[in-house]
Amino acid sequence: VFLKYLDRRQFIAGSLTVAICSVVSSQPPAQASQLNQDNYEFSLNGWPVQNPADEVSTIEKCDISGISSSCEMRIGDVNIILSDLVRQMHYRVKDIKPGEISGWKAKTEEAIQTPYSNLSSGTALQIRPSMPIDSYFAYEIKIIQEVLKDYEGIVSWGGDMTNKDESLFYINASPEDPLFLEVAEKVRVRNFADVRIN
């Protein structure tokens, strides 16, 4: 069903999710979300906060093939899902130009108990972070909502927050969440199927 939108989405196929970043997984303690508020070691969604400069970091600058853009995000399944999301936004909502995507950011005390903390774990990104509120037309919002449905609640949008930020998209699940793993696998399989079709 998801493959039937725009003709130029066919172009996505060869670039999807054969992620240029290597696949690494990390498993925080089961109570990561609670620990987040105590020691700032985890972002709000339960992923370890990291710094790309660290030798053991799983945050890398990942090319989002097909749209000539890149951003720093967590490699592996997070990259699989978020890169797919960016391409859907590019081809189905509005063209994304180089430099319009922002990924990992260093943790801040102000953001630690908000969805913005997910940027510090490499599990979130912002598309046009400087754009004004209510920049999307109603039909574009409808398409964004359709795109998000395919991720089965694993990806959340800042446009739905009380203090909305339409630029923000983030993983809304912990690393060990079975649905997160299922959705990542679904996206991976679908993308390879697209490559074979074309």
Describe the role of every protein-language-model region.
Residues 92-97, 103-135:
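Mid-length scaffold segments of soluble, non-membrane domains
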Residues 18-20, 29-30:
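Cleavable N-terminal signal peptides
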Residues 77-85, 123, 140-144:
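Stable alpha-helical elements in mature extracytoplasmic
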Residues 85-93, 131, 148-152:
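Sec/Tat-exported extracytoplasmic proteins
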Residues 1-19:
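N-terminal secretory signal peptides and thylakoid transit peptides that target proteins
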